[in-house]
Regions:
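Transmembrane alpha-helix boundary signature
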Residues: 5-23, 61
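Core segments of transmembrane alpha-helices
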Residues: 2-6, 154-163
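Membrane-interfacial helical/loop segments at transmembrane boundaries in membrane proteins
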Residues: 17-39
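Alpha-helical transmembrane segments of multipass membrane proteins
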Residues: 56, 163-165
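Transmembrane helix interruption/hinge and helix-loop junction motifs
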Residues: 168-174
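Membrane-embedded catalytic scaffold of the fatty acid hydroxylase/desaturase
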Residues: 45-158, 206-278
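Hydrophobic alpha-helical segments, chiefly the membrane-spanning helices
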Residues: 305-307
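Conserved small/polar residues in nucleotide/adenosyl-binding loops
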Residues: 294-301
Length: 307
């Protein structure tokens, strides 16, 4: 409900901006906090950016619930739909958790790719996975692709109420505000995928192990991201609740998510920092097949540096 309310409040801000209500103090709270009528351009920009950031936090809870069944999974889909990414729930469970570290997993960033290139490639790759999965599933059931049984289509239909709300609040300005929220929140999601598995390689058909994750057990990361940094145990026991996840001694990048995110925003610094960590991983954790595979892919991933 909190994340639904956030969108409703932002839509109200858009409406206030578009209706040109005069900006003036109408009252104060506790004789300290002024309450204004109307919305300025700066107000709208700030409200949109902050809503996008908090919607990204909602995605963290959507991820947690995607590993549940029944009503909890539906809540996960609805939460992700607020960011235009309801497909994530199926892609995460049936693609990422099964194909971790392989080329078939769009959520795993290969070496050399930037966070910006990964954002688009991962989002589109996961959506395509669910598209293909549903196409095959419906064909086996003898049903057409354009069916209400298509969970890929239903996922995007779940986002329509948000689009309608913002269009009614402010026309295309409202839709632009919503699109900005989606861009920011999904960038946060893909940033987490980027930090959690960057450059780690699992040769296809090898078992998924602790070493195929960058763990993060820093205190603030654990509190703020509800233990999502304990990726190794999470991928080993996917249906385990976040408060039951343990530090299993998997490889780690040395800093909390906020610091690592700041480094990733500047690709040359990120690649410089991670080069040593990956070299250590190759020495201590990679199998002979993975090391050979790394060298074979080195030239392919160089092209991603321009992304």
């Amino acid at each position: 409900p909190v994340f639904v309310i956030l969108q409703v409040v932002l839509a109200w801000r858009v409406y206030g901006y578009m209706s040109a209500v005069p900006v003036e103090i109408v009252t104060t709270w506790f004789s300290l906090i002024p309450v204004y009528s109307g919305t300025t351009s700066i107000n709208l920009i700030g409200a949109t950016l902050s809503t996008g950031i908090f919607a990204g936090i909602g995605i963290i809870y959507g991820h947690e619930l995607s590993h549940c069944k029944g009503f909890a999974f539906l809540i996960s889909r609805m939460t992700m739909a607020l960011s235009g990414s309801a497909h994530f729930c199926y892609a995460h469970v049936y693609n990422h958790h099964l194909e971790l570290g392989c080329e078939d997993d769009p959520a795993t960033a290969p070496r050399g790719r930037t966070i910006y290139g990964h954002y688009a490639l991962s989002y589109l790759g996961q959506s395509k996975f669910v598209y293909d999965m549903e196409k095959e599933r419906l064909a086996r059931m003898g049903k057409g692709f354009f069916s209400f049984d298509n969970r890929w289509i239903r996922g995007y239909l779940m986002s329509i109420p948000s689009v309608v709300l913002f269009f009614m609040a402010g026309g295309w300005i409202g839709v632009a505000a919503l699109a900005t929220v989606w861009i920011i929140s999904n960038f946060e999601l893909e940033a987490l995928n980027y930090l959690e598995h960057y450059g780690l390689i699992r040769v296809k058909d090898q078992p998924i192990d602790y070493r195929h994750n960058w763990d993060n057990n820093t205190l603030f990361t654990s509190w703020f991201f509800i233990e999502i940094g304990r990726q190794a145990d999470h991928h080993d026991r996917g249906e385990t609740h976040f408060w039951e996840l343990e530090n299993v001694g998997a490889p780690n990048t040395g800093w909390g998510y906020f610091t690592m995110f700041a480094l990733a925003l500047v690709p040359p610094i990120w690649h410089w920092y991670m080069r040593k960590r990956l070299a250590t991983w190759d020495t201590k954790f990679a199998t002979a097949e993975a090391v050979s595979y790394t060298h074979l892919r080195a030239h392919e991933t160089e092209a991603d540096l321009v992304c």
